[in-house]
Amino acid sequence: MNSPKMTLEQELAAAVAIVRIGLDRIRDAACRTEAVGPHAAALQALYDPAKPDAGVLAFVADVIGTITVSVTEVDHDDIERVTELLDEAKGHVQDSTGDRIRHALALLEPLLQRCEECGQQKPDVDVMADPFSTALYPEETDHRQIPLCPPCATKRFEES
């Protein structure tokens, strides 16, 4: 049994819709609060200086690069210019845009909360009831509130 094929236009429209949903999720995660952490985390999802090949911009650059290589098979006088333009576009996506996001993240970093356990300033540090005392004394209601990143919160809970 053959399933109906989508036209190229339908296939690309579906792909664009999926990308739009993903970008909407990134934007919503950042903007649901005034806290700096979610904003920085969303920017890192777009471009993470520690992992420049893993963010959204890297994926966009990769698609442009693959299309650039593929289009070289087209026999036309202007293909060399097309590939030059696409190479420039790829560079702008990851280098120029990524560099600006990297600078923005560097400016936001001092505003991030510092984890009380590991001392690092990370976007995912959250102020919470101490997992150690909460696990040992669940009946208590007045646990100390401390800023912890998820790995340190888990570690404190496991130590209880």
What are these regions (language model features)?
Residues M1-S3, E159-S160:
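C-terminal end-of-chain micro-motif
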Residues G119, P150-A153:
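Cys/His-coordinated zinc-binding microdomains
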Residues N2-L108, C115, Y137, A153:
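Hydrophobic alpha-helical segments that drive targeting, anchoring, or assembly
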Residues D124-V125, K155-E159:
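Short, non-ligating residues that shape and space the ligands of small metal-coordination modules
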Residues L112-D142:
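Short recognition patches in nucleic-acid-associated and regulatory proteins
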Residues H143-P147:
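Extracellular interaction modules
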Residues L148-P151, E158:
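Cys/His-enriched low-complexity segments
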